[in-house]
Amino acid sequence: WVDEEIMKVRNPFAGLLALFFVVAWCLSGSAAFAKPLVPLRTAWLGEHETFLVWYAREKGWDKAEGLDLELLPFESGKNVIDEMQSSNWAIAGVGAMPALTASLSSRLYIVGIGNDESASNAIFTRADSPILKMKGFNPNCPEVYGNPGSVRGKTFIVPKGTSAHYMLSRWLHVLGLNERDVNIVDMQPSEAMKAFADGQGDAIALWAPQTFE
């Protein structure tokens, strides 16, 4: 799945402008060209594109462009969208499903695609799960584990309305099932990880960085 990220275009006349500002400072003092920074509240998940924005802020590149970046952390893209009004963020980076559902309802605009992180989404089950006993039930998807008999009635922990939720739905479709054939428990990633580690659920669907744990 994909995520948005901000891309910065540099002015080819930046050096000339810098020289102009230095001259202005020499002539009339620093107060003549110093402008208050524009606050920019943004929302992010613990993913790759967030590091890029964090690094830019650490280096002071936001202030160099007249911005004062604020990074709000969230556990899922659905939470980012749900709290859009209360958090009052202007720009965010989320997965495909939250972005698409929000844009279709005219709640936001998609301004760019950052990268393809579909490989970071995964469904995990325990080593002794019957789901792992069959592979290739659907001849069109020979590498996919599970069959209707081993999956029907099982409990899956997943943050609803996310890319992982969509992936789970598509996996069920490959096996000839749908969400009504299983039990879905809605939990945010950190809570879901703890619950699964404590023995709850038969499988869990998440994305990076949880999938690396």
Residue ranges and their predicted role:
Residues 1-6:
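Short, Lys/Arg-enriched N-terminal segments with co-localized hydrophobic residues
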Residues 7-8, 29-31:
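N-terminal compositionally biased, intrinsically disordered segments and leader/signal-like regions
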Residues 7-17:
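Bacterial N-terminal signal peptides that target proteins for export
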Residues 16-29:
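Bacterial N-terminal signal peptides
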Residues 35-179, 183-188, 202-209:
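Short, glycine-/small- and polar/acidic-enriched structural segments
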Residues 186, 193-198, 213:
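A residue-level marker of the well-folded mature domains of exported/periplasmic proteins
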